[in-house]
Amino acid sequence: MSFPKVLNFKISNRRIGLKYKPLIIVELGINHNGKFSIAKQIIDKAKMAGAEIIKHQTHLPDFEMSEEAKKIIPAHTKDNIFKIISDCSLSESDEIKLKQYIQKKK
C-alpha cells in the first residue's frame, strides 16, 4: 500500500509523517479543574512524558453556552454542564500566564 505524499508535512520545524517518530499531543481539557497550579503540573508531567504539543481550549461559559446548558446534568455528576464548565475554566489572567508558561517550556 502506498500513501500519498500529503501525509508528510511540518508543524513549525517538526516533521510529521510515516518515517518520523510519532508526535505526542496532550489534551489539557478541563482536567485542571480551573486551577492554574494543576494546569502547570499537567504541562510539566506531559513534557516529562515526551509531549511536544499541548492542546488547550479557553472556555467562556457565559458566551458559549445557552440557558439550556443549565438544565443538562451529565450522568456522572449532580451538577449541570454550565456549572461544570464554569468551575473548570481558568480566569483570563491565568489563561495568559498559562500560554506564557507553555511557551517557556519549548
Protein language model features and the residues they cover:
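Conserved, mostly hydrophobic/aromatic
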Residues: 27, 46
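Structural/interface elements that position substrates and couple domains in central-metabolism enzymes
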Residues: 22-25, 76-81, 103
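Active-site glycine- and acidic-residue-rich loops that bind
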Residues: 31-37
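A structural motif corresponding to the C-terminal end of an alpha-helix
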Residues: 49, 93-106
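N-terminal amphipathic alpha-helix/helix-capping segment at the start of soluble metabolic enzymes
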Residues: 1-26
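Glycine-rich, proline-tolerant flexible connector loops at the mouths of alpha/beta enzymes
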Residues: 52-89
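Active-site-adjacent beta->alpha loops and helix N-cap segments on the catalytic face
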Residues: 7, 36, 63-69, 92-95
